[in-house]
Structure formats: C-alpha cells, structure tokens
Amino acid sequence: MASNSSSCPTPGGGHLNGYPVPPYAFFFPPMLGGLSPPGALTTLQHQLPVSGYSTPSPATIETQSSSSEEIVPSPPSPPPLPRIYKPCFVCQDKSSGYHYGVSACEGCKGFFRRSIQKNMVYTCHRDKNCIINKVTRNRCQYCRLQKCFEVGMSKESVRNDRNKKKKEAPKPECSESYTLTPEVGELIEKVRKAHQETFPALCQLGKYTTNNSSEQRVSLDIDLWDKFSELSTKCIIKTVEFAKQLPGFTTLTIADQITLLKAACLDILILRICTRYTPEQDTMTFSEGLTLNRTQMHKAGFGPLTDLVFAFANQLLPLEMDDAETGLLSAICLICGDRQDLEQPDRVDMLQEPLLEALKVYVRKRRPSRPHMFPKMLMKITDLRSISAKGAERVITLKMEIPGSMPPLIQEMLENSEGLDTLSGQPGGGGRDGGGLAPPPGSCSPSLSPSSNRSSPATHSP
C-alpha cells in the first residue's frame, strides 16, 4: 500500500492523475471549482505549469476589459436617415408609406380600405379608362379602385389588418353608458322634426288600394305608372325640403347641395317607402295613402326592382327604427363626402360627423342591451346604394315602356354624376344636346336646387 502511495504523481510533478497537464490551464478552473474547495483550487492553480501561457484571473480580465473600453470608446451611432417613399402608385400624390402592399397616400389607402370593407360596387360612366391622378382621383371611384388593384393593392391585406385589429381591440363593456348632451339632443330633435314634417307616419295616412287585382306580372300598367310617377315627383320635392332643414346643409355651395341631392335622393326615397311596409299584407303605402302589393308595384314601374325593395323592407323590420333614427340615417345618406364631383368634400364630411355621433348615441341609449344595432343601421346605407344603382338602370328600360316622356323632376334626379349619363340625348331626356335640366357648374337648378323658391303642391305629404 505504501509503495502504491509513493508512486502516485504529486501536483508539483507536472501531472495530474497520470495525465499531462495541457498548456491551456485556464480551461480547468471553472470545471474544478465545483469539485474542489476554494482553498484547494487556489493552491492547485499556483502549482500548475505555465508552459508559455499565463492564466488570467477573473479580476485581471475585468480590469483589462474596463481599461480597454476607456481607451477606445465606441463611436456614436449615426442618426437614422429619413425614409423616402416613392409617390403614391395610384394617384402620384405624396406617399405616407407602404399600405396594403404598395406605396400609397393616405387618401388612396383610406379609399381602398373602405371599398373592400364595405364591399362597395362602383360604376364608371365613361369608358372604364379614366385617368387617375391627384386632381381627378375623386371623379371616378370605379377606375380608382381598378387602379388600386392594378398597382398591386391586396384585398387580403385589408381583411388581415381588420382581423388583427379585432383581436387586439379590447372587448367593449356592455354596461357602457351614453349621455345625450344638450347639443346632440337638439340636433336629434331638428332632424326628427324635419323628417316628420316631410314624411308623415303610416298611421297618419288613410290607406286605399287600386281596382287592379290581377296577380300576373305582365307589362307596365299605364294608369298605375301615371299615379306612381305623380306621387314620386311630390316625394322628391319633400326630400329637398327635408335637406334644407338639416343643420348646415344650406351653408354648402349650391353646386354641392345639388350634387348631394341628386346622388342621395333615390336612396332616401327607397328608405322612406320601406318604413311603410306592412308585412302582414305584404304591401307598401305611398303618399296620400296609396297602398300597393308586390304585383301592383311591379306594374307601377318597379319591374325587376320590386323583390329587392321588398327584401330590404323585411331587413329593416328587426331594427325597429323610429322617426329620429330614420331621419338621421337619411341625413347621413345625403350628407356624405365620398360623392363624386363635390367641390368641398372635407366640409361635407365635417357636417356628417355630428350626425353619425348623434345616431350612435341615440341608438345605444335607446337599446342599451344591443350594442351592435348602430353598425347594423350604417350597413343599410351600402344596401341602399346598391338598390339605387339598379333603380337608375331600371329607368333606362322604363323609358322605352312608357308612352310619353319621363317626368322632368324624376329624370333630373337620376341624371347625376353617379346616375344615368346614358340618358343624354334620348327623347324627352335631359342630355347636353336636348336642353337638359341638369345645371352647369356653379348655376342653380330650377327644380332640385335647395335655394329654389319652388314649393310643393298643396297635397298630402308623401
């Protein structure tokens, strides 16, 4: 046993457990630190051979590192260069960044997002090849949207962005309360009064029907058409009166007032008549109490538009809208800054904002347990525009069915920047070559102008 003990190499002999110590002795202290007590580790480090290399202590490394930093300071980071984007790919305006896959300005970004989210359907009234630039981008929404697609804007990016915001947005509190401020309350009452004075409720009308009881959807009934066109003219006049009572509307330029009325008149007429729908009899009641069923409305001139109007009326029933809500929704349809050829679209948007706020507060205060009713109402505006576009197309075929000319006020209402340019030059039409009713820019329309002194006939309100 003694001989075995004496034959073991000692630390001072340059070997450890029979193996030569490598020259890189500083690899071992970390590993040995967990196996040997601190005192033994220090003794062992002093006994290990150096072999040309010294083992720096942690304190030495730290001192060298800190002194090195003091001698050679790191250079300061240069300031980031401002990002310069290419002009907007759609209209060549100044770009605010990359939106939905391309460099775009704020205007085109917002237009594309709204168009996709609301599934907007636009129509080009020229050759579907309009020039889109900073000046002309608001003149043709159809060609502007097509240009967005052509330059690479992505529908999926809009949807993904919307879904991302939905996930990130906190869930609204159902107990959120909405208080009607005096200003909002006054605005609501003004709009309610304007609506009621130009559109009496169904209960105020004495219903009457026609003698035509045929249930076959055949050709146009001329007698029904004559009566319906007469009532429609009165409805248009009442719509103009409604617009003149809306706060701020008459402060707009005359040209913008006419543009808004022509663009939204059919929307408002359809919304109004659909609030007079009676589901039990499947009938609609017009001004003076004229009540028609589906077949009679088809013969009166609605034609293939009939089922669309009745379907929309059925969709309104669950909303249970009162006069204030119908009036506010009509006002929002009318005062809308995205209509074509407006001189001051930003000012129109400013007038629309308090109407939107008033409708939101009123709807949520009236239905505190149904927070989604307000957006549902706003979505009906998109449906109205779609039906109105088809209604304008219906006029083209209707002109070939009626024996005489189209009533002037109805034709003028539909001959607008978003309606029927194709009526120009037709018999009885208001085209450029036919002494049209539409006024030139800056002039006042003799019939649709809100500043006109023309008053409605002394008949029942529509």
UniProtKB/Swiss-Prot annotation:
Region (Modulating): 1-87
Entry's Gene Ontology molecular function annotations: DNA-binding transcription factor activity, RNA polymerase II-specific; nuclear glucocorticoid receptor binding; nuclear receptor activity; RNA polymerase II cis-regulatory region sequence-specific DNA binding; zinc ion binding
Keyword match Transferase: no
Region (Disordered): 52-77, 419-462
Gene3D superfamilies the UniProt entry points to: Erythroid Transcription Factor GATA-1, subunit A, Retinoid X Receptor
Cross-link (Glycyl lysine isopeptide (Lys-Gly) (interchain with G-Cter in SUMO)): 166, 171, 399
Sequence positions that bind all-trans-retinoate: 235, 287
Residue numbers bearing the Phosphoserine modification: 77, 96, 219, 369
Zinc finger annotations (NR C4-type) as residue ranges: 88-108, 124-148
Composition bias type Gly residues, residue spans: 426-437
PROSITE patterns cross-referenced by the UniProt entry: NR_LBD (PS51843), NUCLEAR_REC_DBD_1 (PS00031), NUCLEAR_REC_DBD_2 (PS51030)
SUPFAM superfamilies hit by this protein: Glucocorticoid receptor-like (DNA-binding domain), Nuclear receptor ligand-binding domain
Domain NR LBD: 183-417
Keywords: Cytoplasm, DNA-binding, Isopeptide bond, Metal-binding, Nucleus, Phosphoprotein, Receptor, Transcription, Transcription regulation, Ubl conjugation, Zinc, Zinc-finger
Pfam families listed in its UniProt record: Hormone_recep, zf-C4
Extent of Low complexity compositional bias: 444-462
Subunit record text: Heterodimer; with RXRA. Binds DNA preferentially as a heterodimer. RXRA serves as enhancer to induce RARA binding to RARE. Interacts with NCOA3 and NCOA6 coactivators, leading to a strong increase of transcription of target genes. Interacts with NCOA7 in a ligand-inducible manner. Interacts (via the ligand-binding domain) with PRAME; interaction is direct and ligand (retinoic acid)-dependent. Interacts with PRKAR1A; the interaction negatively regulates RARA transcriptional activity.
Domain notes: Composed of three domains: a modulating N-terminal domain, a DNA-binding domain and a C-terminal ligand-binding domain.
Annotated family: Belongs to the nuclear hormone receptor family. NR1 subfamily.
Protein purpose: Receptor for retinoic acid. Retinoic acid receptors bind as heterodimers to their target response elements in response to their ligands, all-trans or 9-cis retinoic acid, and regulate gene expression in various biological processes. The RXR/RAR heterodimers bind to the retinoic acid response elements (RARE) composed of tandem 5'-AGGTCA-3' sites known as DR1-DR5. In the absence of ligand, the RXR-RAR heterodimers associate with a multiprotein complex containing transcription corepressors that induce histone deacetylation, chromatin condensation and transcriptional suppression.
PANTHER family tied to this protein: NUCLEAR HORMONE RECEPTOR (PTHR24085), RETINOIC ACID RECEPTOR ALPHA (PTHR24085:SF8)
Protein name: Retinoic acid receptor alpha
Organism: Canis lupus familiaris (Dog)
